[in-house]
């Protein structure tokens, strides 16, 4: 039962679903050289999809691409939320420094409630896909909602998006 991942210093990329359904995995520590989560394609999933016990990400302080804050993974500038661990909590307030929710950042997590600040402008591709417990979202200042951003959020019953300019293909597909 895999509980922790500590990668070699040479690790640069983790591909889609590399650790999918490792249900005992609790912590992931990313090394200095790590640079890429391969989740850009419409057919790729979060490398940690289905890791239901995942509590926190940790990043080597010398990494120039990513950093973790309170267990959540962000880009180095902390303007993009990259990945949210499933056991972080079922309610989360997006920090004020975040501008973009990254592709597949919350995919498949058990989050029930997300509080968006007025600084979030974009929700990436499949960012909340398969978040079956998510009930409502208020996308205060979000302008762009990418494809499948909230796809298969089967409990979603209320969405407010007063400033939306672009809603992607299958953004709210059931």
Regions found by a protein language model. Give the residues of each.
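Structural signature of tandem-repeat unit edges
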Residues: 1-13, 22-40, 51-72, 76-79, ...
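Beta-strand repeat architectures
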Residues: 45-53, 173-174
């Amino acid at each position: 039962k895999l509980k922790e991942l500590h990668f070699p210093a040479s690790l640069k990329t983790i591909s889609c679903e590399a650790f999918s359904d490792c249900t005992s995995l609790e912590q992931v520590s990313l090394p200095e050289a790590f640079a890429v989560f391969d989740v850009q394609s419409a057919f790729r999933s979060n490398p940690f999809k289905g890791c239901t016990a995942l509590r926190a990400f940790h990043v080597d302080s010398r990494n120039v691409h990513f950093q973790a804050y309170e267990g959540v993974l962000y880009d180095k500038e902390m303007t993009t939320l990259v990945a949210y661990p499933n056991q972080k909590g079922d309610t989360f307030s997006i920090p004020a420094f975040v501008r973009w929710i990254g592709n597949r950042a919350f995919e498949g997590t058990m989050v029930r409630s997300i509080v968006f600040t007025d600084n979030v402008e974009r929700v990436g591709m499949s960012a909340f896909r398969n978040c079956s417990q998510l009930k409502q979202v208020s996308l205060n200042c979000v302008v762009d909602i990418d494809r499948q951003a909230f796809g298969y959020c089967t409990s979603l019953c209320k969405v407010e998006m007063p400033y939306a300019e672009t809603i992607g293909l299958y953004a709210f597909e059931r």
